[in-house]
Amino acid sequence: MIVTTSPNIEGKQIIEYKKIVFGEIITGVNFMKDIGAGLRNFFGGRSQGYEDELINAREEAIKEMEQRAQDIGANAVIGVDIDYEVLGADNGMLMVTASGTAVVIEAQDY
């Protein structure tokens, strides 16, 4: 499946626009990662634990969006946008949302 932030796919004709599809992931932040991130904040540097969590959440949101597109017969998603939001009273949750337009593009001629 082709997934792109562009509104079209160069060299491909869009045959059918299906609908907007979403993939949402909400993940909690681990207490041990919080401690490590706090120390790195104090001393400077990057928080690998938070970065890994962010990367995993983004990949899962995109994967969920792709699956929803496939479920309705699409073979591509265009105009993809990814949003991030911190949730919870103590900002201990991260929500990642991937959205785009599910479309059917012309088949490959192999």
Curated annotation (Swiss-Prot):
This is UPF0145 protein lse_0194. NCBIfam families: PRK01119.1. Gene3D superfamilies: Hypothetical protein apc22750. Chain B. PANTHER family: UPF0145 PROTEIN YBJQ. It comes from the Bacteria. Belongs to the UPF0145 family. It comes from Listeria seeligeri serovar 1/2b (strain ATCC 35967 / DSM 20751 / CCM 3970 / CCUG 15530 / CIP 100100 / LMG 11386 / NCTC 11856 / SLCC 3954 / 1120). Pfam families: YbjQ_1. SUPFAM superfamilies: YbjQ-like (SSF117782). HAMAP family: UPF0145 (MF_00338).
